[in-house]
From Swiss-Prot:
Membrane side Extracellular: residue ranges: 194-666
Cellular localisation: Membrane
Residues in compartment: Cytoplasmic: 688-776
Cofactor note: Binds 1 zinc ion per subunit.
Major localization listed first in the record, in broad terms: membrane
Disintegrin domain residues: 408-494
Function: May play a role in the adhesive and proteolytic events that occur during lymphocyte emigration or may function in ectodomain shedding of lymphocyte surface target proteins, such as FASL and CD40L. May be involved in sperm maturation.
GO biological process terms held by the UniProt record: proteolysis
Motif (Cysteine switch) on chain: 168-175
Origin species: Macaca fascicularis (Crab-eating macaque)
Protein name stated in the entry: Disintegrin and metalloproteinase domain-containing protein 28
Compositional bias of kind Basic residues: 709-718
Segments passing through the bilayer: 667-687
Membrane topology: Single-pass type I membrane protein
Length: 776
């Protein structure tokens, strides 16, 4: 039937030949001749090259391993985010940013038809180039001729399982979770608690920014088109991998340092990562909105390292970064490293023996091999889900806004752009019953197509809770009856008491000394005595309030609780370089990198009755937040939020907060259903008692030895043992004869330095991907 419907040419048999090109891990290839299957009538096939450029789906037929295989490909419409930009520099160093209208139609993903476990990442720009799997076998395909025509010869590389060779190791087997100690007052990325708690069901969007250094520019003969094609193919592969986690990786921008490197890049991967992190945090946010940035470098890192990233820092303004060495001509090996380092940003550990990998090798395997990673292990999936429970992850749930998109709107690309109400893809792809796929408009008679306040294509009633309060410093958000979207997240007014009076709310958080001690030193830590904090009046590096250049400013008497953080107990295994200083019952940390305020009391911390720390000063709450009696100015059942705006209490409809019909309706429902539930429960108990009596009577009868049916035994639920991450080993060096500053009493010092040298930053822990291979 398929043959009758499609215009097909016969395939020549594949001809095995000896390898004439040398690729990492590949000894030989065979020649195949992919034939494109055209689903059009002959009279419609007039300009195949032009038609292919715009087709959403493609099929290619070829002989693979002696059998006919049909490769189904679907265009990756989200490879480039709307508003994609490219930045380069002219000979004078002037920055030039463009928004090229790139037709990324030649980048596809798909699978082999009728194969249960199969996937593919293919570029059709100049023949077929990329990866696909068939069963347990992985293949790489690329054209042998520069001439693009149907049926041209391609090299098909087969990766032999017997050639698998773990000749590389990773030095970060014992990575610890590290909490972000950046200023908690920053509300840009706030913890997301999904209502149903099932992160897997929600689509995530990673806005991906790639920077290529000057060495890369020269490595590819200063040919920006060649670099672009290579980068797009790598990004396409990374996107294919993360789609398995219901996550879209869209390239929002690419930057090439065409004149010179903007940072100091050295073989020391940690040093390079730290420099790139600082450059990214100070330069990129003003240029382009993005969630993560990676540097691709031609510099060979020292030892076996080919990649490095901070641990569990996705969405962080400075540390959501990674550096990757362009270590192989095989771009998919480099793409695998890019995906691996991104995994560390999501808090994924390296896979160990207890992890279940559904493919030959998974993304977070600790070593590079001849295989390209094709999936995530069970451990990686658990770590990924945990990231969304514990970390700041808002940036991954916000798809680009229509007003942020500067490219020409295209209906059917699954991105809502200017002039569109919705975009559910093509008519074949669309599953949204509220959206007209042909016009990208809401269907007649409907009000909305999606959102927390949209139900069955209609707005939910005003006052219905769409985002419950997460904690005592948060406020619930209610639908307004005019939109399908839930309003922006709002918090309690800054200065609202929390943690049983131990703190005051600030931007949705409740900063306390105890919380900060636990974050720094781990469980079992407690806040040190007041006498320890009095040392902040000394103005030494073991007790001060502020740092101005290299000068340490002592605390005033009233501000001692707002300077250096002093704690008791806890662990001495810290992930940062520096000195652990202990005297009497006081313990503090002196970081090697003074640019980050590790070990200082955070803004918003309570320092007295109705007083909080702001910029190392203990000030009145009213002076700090100007929120006193704010709620008294709100009308109806409303309270003040963190921006001193009035917001309705739960169950009261905006904007006036005087309509409780939602609460009244709920009360009626409860009043009706409660008696019904009670009656149902009583009936169930009576029936159960009667059944029990009948069963007892039957049990008293003699048992027959014939004609009995075996009872099906209920399986006992198996206990799943949780696998704990290995503890990080640390090299500890005791230093005894350190000079004592001023009248400081003798103190014991402990230099905390991981055996793997991470960048000296606060919360994030760096994690590397190592390759002992000669750089391929």
């Amino acid at each position: 039937m398929l043959q009758a419907l499609l215009t097909v040419s016969l395939l020549l048999s594949p001809v095995p030949v000896s390898a004439i090109k040398e690729l990492p891990g590949v000894k030989k290839y065979e020649v195949v001749y992919p034939i494109r299957l055209h689903p059009l009538h002959k009279r419609e096939v007039k300009e195949p090259e032009q038609q292919e450029q715009f087709e959403t789906e493609l099929k290619y037929k070829m002989t693979v391993n002696g059998k006919i295989a049909v490769l189904y490909l679907k265009k990756n419409k989200n490879l480039l985010a709307p508003g994609y930009t490219e930045t380069y520099y002219n000979s004078t160093g002037k920055e030039i940013t463009t928004s090229p209208q790139i037709m990324d139609d030649c980048y596809y993903q798909g699978h082999i038809i009728n194969e249960k476990d199969s996937d593919a990442s293919i570029s059709t720009c100049r023949g077929l180039r990329g990866y696909f799997s068939q069963g347990n076998q992985r293949y790489f395909i690329e054209p042998l001729s520069p001439i693009h025509r149907d049926g041209q010869e391609h090299a098909l590389f087969k990766y032999d399982p017997e050639e698998k060779n773990y000749d590389s190791t990773c030095g970060t087997d014992g990575v610890l979770w590290v909490h972000d100690l950046q200023n908690i007052a920053r509300p840009a990325t706030r913890l997301v608690k999904l209502n149903d708690g099932k992160v897997q069901k929600h689509e995530k969007y990673i806005e991906y920014y790639l920077v290529l250094d000057n060495g890369e520019f020269k490595k590819y003969n200063e040919n920006q088109d060649e670099i672009r094609k290579r980068v797009f193919e790598m990004a396409n592969y990374v996107n294919m991998l993360y789609k398995k986690l219901n996550t879209h990786v869209a390239l929002v921008g690419m930057e090439i340092w065409t004149d010179e490197d903007k940072i100091n890049i050295t073989p020391n991967a940690s040093f390079t990562l730290e420099n790139f992190s600082k450059w990214r945090g100070s330069v990129l946010p003003r240029r382009k909105r993005h969630d993560i940035a990676q540097l691709i470098t031609a510099t060979e890192f020292a030892g076996m390292t080919v990649g490095l990233a901070f641990m569990s820092t996705m969405c962080s303004p400075y540390h959501s970064v990674g550096v990757v060495q362009d270590h192989s001509d095989n771009l998919l090996r480099v793409a695998g490293t890019m995906a691996h380092e991104m995994g560390h940003n999501f808090g994924m550990f390296h896979d160990n023996y207890s992890c279940k990998c559904p493919s030959t090798i998974c993304v977070m395997d600790k070593a590079l091999s001849f295989y390209i990673p094709t999936d995530f292990s069970s451990c990686s999936r658990v770590s990924y889900d945990k990231f969304f429970e514990d970390k700041l992850s808002n940036c991954l749930f916000n798809a680009p806004l229509p007003t942020d998109i500067i490219s020409t709107p295209i209906c059917g690309n699954q991105m809502v752009e200017m002039g569109e109400d919705c975009d559910c893809g093509t008519s074949e792809e669309c599953t949204n019953i509220c959206c007209d796929a042909k016009t990208c408009k809401i269907k007649a008679g409907f009000q909305c197509t999606s959102g927390e306040c949209c139900e069955k294509c209609q707005f939910k009633k005003a006052g219905m809770v769409c985002r419950p309060a997460k904690d005592e410093c948060d406020l619930p958000e209610m639908c307004d009856g005019k939109s399908g979207n839930c309003p922006d997240d709002r918090f309690r007014a800054n200065g609202f008491p929390c943690h049983h009076g131990k703190g005051y709310c600030l931007m949705g958080a409740c900063p306390t000394l105890q919380e900060q001690c636990t974050e720094l030193w781990g469980p079992g830590t407690k806040v040190a005595d007041q006498s320890c904090y009095n040392r902040n009046e000394g103005g030494s590096k073991y007790g001060y309030c502020r740092r101005v250049d290299d000068t340490l400013i002592p605390c005033k008497t009233n501000d001692t609780m707002c300077g250096k953080l002093f704690c008791q107990g806890g662990s001495d295994n810290l992930p940062w370089k520096g000195r652990i200083v202990t005297f009497l019952t006081c313990k503090t940390f002196d970081p090697e990198d003074t640019s980050e305020e590790i070990g200082m009391v955070a803004n918003g911390t309570k320092c007295g009755h109705n007083k909080v720390c702001i910029n190392a000063e203990c000030v009145d709450i009213e002076k700090a937040y100007k929120s006193t009696n704010c709620s008294s100015k709100c009308k109806g059942h409303a309270v003040c939020d963190h921006e001193l705006q009035c917001q309705c209490e739960e169950g009261w409809s905006p904007p006036d907060c005087d309509d409780s019909s939602v609460v009244f309706y709920f009360s009626i429902v409860v009043a009706v259903l409660f008696p019904v539930a009670v009656i149902s429960l009583v009936v169930a108990i009576v029936i159960r008692q009667q059944s029990s009596r009948e069963k007892q009577k039957k049990d008293q009868r003699p048992l027959s030895t014939t004609g009995t049916r075996p009872h099906k035994q209920k399986r006992k639920p198996q206990m799943v043992k949780a696998v704990q991450p290995q503890e990080m080993s640390q090299m500890k060096l005791h230093v005894y004869d350190l000079p004592v500053e001023g009248n400081e009493p003798p103190a014991s010092f402990l230099i905390s330095k991981p055996d793997f040298s991470p960048p000296p930053i606060p919360a994030p822990r760096s994690s590397s991907f190592l390759d002992s291979n000669p750089k391929a």
